[in-house]
A protein has these predicted regions:
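Short, charge-patterned binding micro-sites
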Residues: 38-72
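Broad gene-expression machinery/nucleic-acid interaction feature
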Residues: 3, 63-67, 116-120
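Short beta-strand-to-loop capping motifs
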Residues: 8, 68-74, 121-125
Length: 154
């Protein structure tokens, strides 16, 4: 088994696809590209793929991660660069693999690896208004977020 971590972009119209839709895109693209994946055991075997943090629908990203468990038992060697080329040829517009690494030994999951995210947000207001919002929030001791979930405020 060869553990491969891919880094990709998600830009353009594909940003409106949900996390689950993107997962289906990856599974289909891996199947079309004939990448030999490891599968789970049981009644409904699934490819062993791990996804990074779910990106909100509508957001673009330069740095999305996915871990693959590639079955290398029937091949003498697998070239990860060939995997990237094959996947990039079959991925939909807006998704592009821009990095790959082979994970050796025991390594932390994607969820454990991500310690921070950087967000670039465009606000359609003038700079002085946005600056006053930021100053007001930065001067608060605590920030309370209220939202409604299942008809109740949480």
């Amino acid at each position: 088994m060869l553990a491969v971590r891919l880094r990709s972009t998600k830009k353009g119209k594909i940003r409106f696809a949900s996390h689950r839709d993107i997962a289906k895109v990856w599974e289909r693209t891996l199947r079309i590209s004939n990448i030999p994946l490891m599968y789970s055991q049981g009644f409904s075997p699934r490819p062993k793929i791990s996804y990074g943090l779910a990106l909100p629908t509508g957001a673009e990203s330069d740095c999305e991660y996915i871990d693959l468990q590639v079955d290398d038992s029937n091949r003498e060697s697998i070239n990860v660069e060939e995997i990237c080329t094959s996947l990039n040829d079959n991925l939909p517009p807006g998704i592009l693999i821009n990095g790959v690494s082979v994970m050796n030994g025991k390594f932390p999951s994607l969820q454990q690896t991500v310690t921070s995210c950087i967000w670039d947000i465009t606000v359609n207001e003038d700079d002085t208004k946005v600056d006053s919002w930021v100053d007001r929030i930065n001067n608060e001791n605590t920030i309370v977020l209220r939202r409604e979930r299942k008809g109740k405020e949480v």
